[in-house]
């Protein structure tokens, strides 16, 4: 099936692009002195010392990504990733419908998947825009929370749909990777639920930052597993 090869190609780029962009922004912030006196001089907020935020949580993703010149990398990368996400969910919807031969052309994972991509686009556009108003601050939190919730729901529903039809596609899939995808989704859900009390409090900044970095990697790691899950179909 051509759609499987398409899904594989899209999946690997959905993993690579945000991971590379995110860590490039981190490297720019950590090595800000390299850009002193150039047109790419890092803004004051973006200047930080050596840190491994995945472990120490010293800095947030937003701080490394929202200042010049990091946002020149981060914003286009996230918007392009969102476009790929839309294509990914549409391709998966077509594949599941084809395998099942169903009349219902729209799966719920498609709605949540496309929704998560739209939230990501909105988050990328408004990142770094300063507007001191409570409603705007609420909107930003709502957008990032919407992306996370919609993305996790979409991933969960897709895994459920694939699990239901796995016997029909056993020659095209890697069942061990399917198990890993199920485990990953469960971990993401449990982590989100356990983290709610911490995220709703005003304390634990380093914990929140470290969780943010690692959770982001966990979310996009799903797409690396998607690439490995489908076996390449020879045309």
Question: Where do the language-model regions lie?
Answer:
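Cytoplasmic juxtamembrane regions at transmembrane-helix boundaries
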Residues: 84-115
């Amino acid at each position: 099936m051509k759609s499987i090869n398409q899904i594989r190609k899209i999946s690997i780029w959905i993993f690579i692009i945000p991971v590379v962009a995110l860590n490039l922004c981190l490297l720019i912030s950590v090595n800000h002195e390299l850009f002193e006196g150039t047109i790419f001089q890092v803004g004051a907020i973006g200047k930080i010392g050596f840190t491994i935020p995945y472990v120490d949580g010293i800095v947030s993703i937003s701080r490394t990504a929202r200042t010049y010149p990091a946002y020149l990398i981060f914003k286009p990368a996230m918007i392009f990733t969102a476009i790929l996400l839309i294509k990914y969910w549409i391709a998966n919807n077509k594949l599941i419908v084809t395998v099942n031969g169903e009349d219902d052309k729209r799966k719920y994972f498609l709605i949540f998947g496309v929704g998560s991509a739209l939230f990501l686009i909105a988050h990328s556009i408004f990142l770094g825009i300063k507007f001191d108003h409570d409603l705007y601050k609420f909107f930003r939190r709502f957008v990032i929370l919407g992306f996370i919730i919609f993305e996790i729901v979409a991933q969960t529903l897709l895994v459920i749909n694939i699990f239901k039809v796995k016997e029909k596609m056993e020659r095209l899939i890697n069942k061990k990777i399917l198990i890993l995808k199920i485990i990953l989704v469960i971990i993401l859900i449990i982590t989100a639920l356990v983290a709610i009390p911490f995220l709703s409090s005003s304390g634990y900044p380093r914990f929140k930052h470290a969780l943010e970095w690692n959770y982001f990697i966990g979310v996009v790691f799903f797409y690396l597993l998607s690439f490995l899950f489908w076996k390449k179909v020879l045309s």
